[in-house]
UniProtKB/Swiss-Prot annotation:
Alphabetical list of Pfam families matching this protein: MTS (PF05175)
InterPro entries: DNA_methylase_N6_adenine_CS, HemK-like, RF_methyltr_PrmC, Ribosome_uL3_MTase, SAM-dependent_MTases_sf, Small_mtfrase_dom
SUPFAM superfamilies from the UniProt entry: S-adenosyl-L-methionine-dependent methyltransferases
Protein task: Methylates large ribosomal subunit protein uL3 on a specific glutamine residue.
Name of this chain's protein: Ribosomal protein uL3 glutamine methyltransferase
GO biological process entries: methylation
Catalysed reactions listed for this entry: L-glutaminyl-[ribosomal protein uL3] + S-adenosyl-L-methionine = N(5)-methyl-L-glutaminyl-[ribosomal protein uL3] + S-adenosyl-L-homocysteine + H(+)
Keyword Nucleotide-binding: no
Organism: Vibrio anguillarum (strain ATCC 68554 / 775)
Keyword Hydrolase: no
Record-stated family: Belongs to the protein N5-glutamine methyltransferase family. PrmB subfamily.
The entry's keywords: Methyltransferase, S-adenosyl-L-methionine, Transferase
Gene Ontology cellular component annotations, sorted alphabetically: cytosol
Amino acid sequence: MDKIFVEEAVSELHTLQDMIRWTVSRFNAANLFYGHGTDNAWDEAVQLILPTLYLPIDVPPHVLNSRLTGSERLRIVERVIKRINERTPIAYLTNKAWFCGLEFYVDERVLVPRSPIGELIEAQFQPWLIDEPVRIMDLCTGSGCIAIACAHAFPDAEVDAIDISTDALQVAEQNIQDHGMEQQVFPIRSDLFRDLPKEKYDLIVSNPPYVDQEDMNSLPKEFKHEPELGLAAGTDGLKLVRRILANAAGYLTDNGILICEVGNSMVHMMNQYDHIPFTWLEFENGGHGVFMLTRQQLVDCASDFALYID
C-alpha cells in the first residue's frame, strides 16, 4: 500500500465510520479474495476494525460517529496493510472468528471456521437425526467450533472433539475453556478413528481435509496462511474421506448418522461412487458438498472401502 494512503488515514480519518469507509475502499482497490467468513469488502472491514478496537460486531449506529485516537487509527491501518500486502485472513489478524453465532479464538494453527455444517447444527440436524443424540463425535475438529456448537445445540450430549494435530487441539482446548464446556466437550488426539476405543455415537460430524491437488495448486493467497494439513487430501481430495467411510459404521449406534463435508470434491465422490445413496444436503445460506449416510447405508457399502479400514 502506498505510503501516502497510510499517512492520510492516520492523520485525516477521525471517526469509526471514516475508518470503515476508508478500509472498504482500500480493500476494493486491492481486489482481495473473500472466503474466510465474509464475502464482501464491507463485512470484511467491519470484522477487522471492530475487534481491533475491542468492540462487538453489532455496535449501535451512533457509535460509528465516535472519534478514534491516533494510536487506534495506527493499529487499524497496520492490520489493513497486512490484510492487503500479505493477504492474511482477518481472523488471523484479530484472532477472532464466528460460527453458529458463537465467537472463537483462531490462529494459523487451525483453519478459519466457515463450514455450511453450521446451518445443520442450528437446525439440530433435522430431519436426519431420529433420536436426540447422547454422544456426538466431531472428527477433524480443528478449532473445536463444530464440537462446541453441537454442545450448545444439544446441551445434554457429550461431544468428543478428534484431531491428529496437537497444535489444533491446543486451540480447541482454549475454545472449550472459553465457552465453559470442559465437562461436555472432550479433545482427543487420534488419526481419524485409528487411536479411538470402539465406542458408539449417535452422530458423527466431520469436516476433514478434502481439497484435491488441482484446487490446492490454484488456491488464492489467503489460503496459504492456513495449515496445509487441514486442507490437502491427495489427488482427488478423498484420501481421508475414504477412511472415514470405511470405519464410521463401527462407531455409530443403530440409528446413528454420518454428516461429512467434501466441498468441491463432491464431483469425485459422485463420479467414483455413483451407486452409493449419498444424501447431498442443501443450504439456504450457501454452501455445498455435504452428505449424509445412515449407519445401515455405511454397512451396505462397506465393500467399497474395505481397503481403507484402520
